[in-house]
Amino acid sequence: MSFRLKPLIVALFASQLSACAVGPDYIRPQAPVATEFKEVKGWKTAQPRDTALSGQWWEIFNDPKLNELESQVASNQSLIQAEAQYRQAQGLVQSAQSSLLPVFNLNGNFNNFKSAQGQTQVISGVRTLFGNTVAMAWEPDLWGKVRRQIEANTGNAQASAATLQALRLSIQSNLAVAYFQLKVLDAQRTLLDETVAAYQKTLDITKNRYAVGVVAKTDVVQADTQLQSAKAQAINLGVQRAKLEHAIAVLIGKSPAELSLAASALTTQAPAIPVSLPSELLERRPDIAAAERKVAAANAQIGIAKAAYFPTLNLAMSNGFQSTDVGDLFTVARRYWAFGPAAAALTVFDGGVKNAQYNQAIAGFDASVAAYRQAVLTGFQEVEDNLAALRILEEQAKVQDQAVASANQALALTNNQYQAGTVSYLNVMTAQTAALSNRQTAVQLQGDRLNAAVLLVKAMGGGWNETLLPTEEQAAGDRKWTDYLILPVDTIGEWVE
């Protein structure tokens, strides 16, 4: 390359970096945010050091088995797929960044030729011409199209990272909900086993009373009906439990055959969960962050569409050596260079394609803004839903405990009356059914409260916050100088082999 061309190349690079980028610069859109949650009265305001807001949020339930299962979520195949999609998005950022740089090609060649007869200035006979050339092609980013593409791809990569975290939180919460529901079924099974034992005892007593002529045969049949019905309910729980166990296995990346969970008592109570301010929710939920980053990407697409209206400039340059003697090919005397062609192009008629693409970009931006605001509203709804659920379920649980106590008392009184012969066995059956139903409801309420607690943590982001989003450098994969080579350094050995 001629020394006189070097200042020109430097100037072109500098002009590219300082040139304007057409299209609107990104401004985060306004979102509907309330000053406080409707259901927040009586709740503790979240603080940065609250355990419930940490990444290991499930530990607030103090269940070692749940902790063990949650630690295996990284093996979930959907999560692995999402992580790969994030790396794909990083690759798109890298590809866009590379478009800012010129492309260099190294060419080596030789040609055999024979001069025409009668050319006295050319040595006659067959000769070989050797050549070695480095060619450069470059399209300067005069209008910021490439830089806007980098912005768009960076926004999409950051959105992909946030989507990955949203999926992780969803899998974690689904696992916790399935686990607690399984424990509810175990508690229901324990309750039914106790009921079956009680009904069996009642049936035996009724048979003895029938044998001595105190009660009718119908009492024995009715007592046996109650017993068999309770047994059938207990067996039916096995179907639901098996499905939940299989679902848990898949959530942690295992086949159903690889996981068996022993039955355990339902002793976990819904913990107190600090609630953050509505304005903080925008920074804590990865799905909202993903929607906002998609808005940024859509905004950059407007600039890309607008840059298409402006002319493009393509530059080419070559530098190399030519000689008929390979021995002196790389000497100064055999060196040559060429600048050009330099070509500028401007589309003057395209049938409205660019206008359509620009309008499409504007519409895409508007759609992404609406999607972002909808994500915010949905986030607020989910927090309110689960705050209300926890409040109402707590009230219901208190009343239900009283109902269980009353039903148990009624059953005891009815049994005494039946043994005294003052009521029929139908009264006993009614009291038994009421007692069992109320106890089952109490167990289910405990599970519902645990589920609502899990979903509230999920609704508040599970300890995630915007600072965990990848930076622009991280969205590009923290590129090293070796990443700009044709072959990554760590794969050259593989290619050689």
Task: Please describe what each predicted stretch is.
Residues 210-214, 418-422, 459-463:
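A short glycine-centered flexible hinge/capping loop motif at secondary-structure junctions
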